[in-house]
């Protein structure tokens, strides 16, 4: 495809777009539903209700939060998917939303050009981040593929950086089926995670219970060619 993700954001080629508005999120902590080990990562899934919404920025419709997940790597210095001027980050958070203004459900929107919007946040190894603790504490309940556990009363906007300056471009899911249906909003500022916290991601297993243990050491896709696309900056 010609619109694959992730990409390397080259600041010298980014276009500052004065028409880009800030984006806003409003998440209902009670909408958080469950945490599940999907074999290549874990997802925190949200109830399908209109309580948790992303709007503004480059988007012309309201987008509803479906789930969030992380990408990480074998080492602390490279676990992100997107890179900035070639610089890598320790991990990357993806908050996945679907276009509820236009489509009836996420299954219908996942293959549409304007179907999904993903907010990405870089994590940089450093201080332990107490805001990640509730998520990390839940991982022991979903050690193996297919396991799920209740996970509620959590507002993922607490994981966003203080500044919501962002880059945006048209791209794809970074895991099969790789649909080219994503408007990406990538926060310029990162949040912190400690080396010990990162290690907890890698302790998750990609195998089902009772099978030989295979840890999920990395699940980050390398940057893909831009192929003529423009990355715009809100700042």
UniProtKB/Swiss-Prot annotation:
Molecular function GO labels: carbonate dehydratase activity; cyanamide hydratase activity; zinc ion binding
EC identifiers of the protein: 4.2.1.1, 4.2.1.69
Residues bound to Zn(2+): 69, 71, 94
Localization (cell): Cytoplasm
Catalytic site positions: 40
Residues in Alpha-carbonic anhydrase domain copies: 1-235
Chief location category: cytoplasm
GO cellular component: cytoplasm
Key words of the record: Cytoplasm, Lyase, Metal-binding, Zinc
Pfam family membership, one: Carb_anhydrase
Positions of substrate binding: 174-175
Record InterPro entries: CA_dom, CA_dom_sf, Carbonic_anhydrase_a-class, Carbonic_anhydrase_a-class_CS
PANTHER family, alphabetized: CARBONIC ANHYDRASE, CARBONIC ANHYDRASE 1
Function: Catalyzes the reversible hydration of carbon dioxide. Can hydrate cyanamide to urea.
Name the UniProt record assigns to this protein: Carbonic anhydrase 1
Protein source organism: Oryctolagus cuniculus (Rabbit)
Gene that this sequence comes from: CA1
């Amino acid at each position: 495809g010609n619109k694959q993700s992730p990409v390397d954001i080259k600041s010298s080629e980014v276009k500052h777009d004065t028409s880009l508005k800030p984006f806003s999120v409003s998440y209902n902590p009670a909408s958080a539903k469950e945490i599940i080990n999907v074999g290549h990562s874990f997802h925190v899934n949200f109830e399908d209700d209109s309580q948790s919404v992303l709007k503004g920025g480059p988007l012309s419709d309201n987008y509803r939060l479906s789930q969030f997940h992380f990408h990480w790597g074998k080492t602390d210095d490279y676990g992100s998917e997107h890179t900035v001027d070639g610089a890598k980050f320790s991990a990357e958070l993806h908050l996945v939303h679907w276009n509820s203004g236009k489509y009836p459900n996420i299954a219908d929107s996942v293959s549409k050009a304007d179907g999904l919007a993903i907010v990405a946040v870089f994590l940089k190894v450093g201080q332990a981040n107490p805001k990640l603790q509730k998520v990390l504490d839940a991982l022991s309940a979903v050690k193996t593929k297919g396991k799920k556990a209740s996970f509620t009363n959590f507002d993922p906007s607490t994981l966003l950086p203080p500044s919501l300056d962002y880059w945006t471009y048209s791209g794809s899911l970074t895991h099969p089926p790789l649909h080219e249906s994503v408007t990406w909003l990538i926060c310029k500022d990162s949040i912190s995670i400690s080396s010990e916290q990162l290690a907890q991601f890698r302790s998750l297993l990609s195998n089902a219970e009772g099978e030989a243990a295979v840890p999920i050491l990395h699940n980050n896709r390398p940057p893909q060619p831009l192929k003529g696309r423009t990355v715009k900056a809100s700042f």
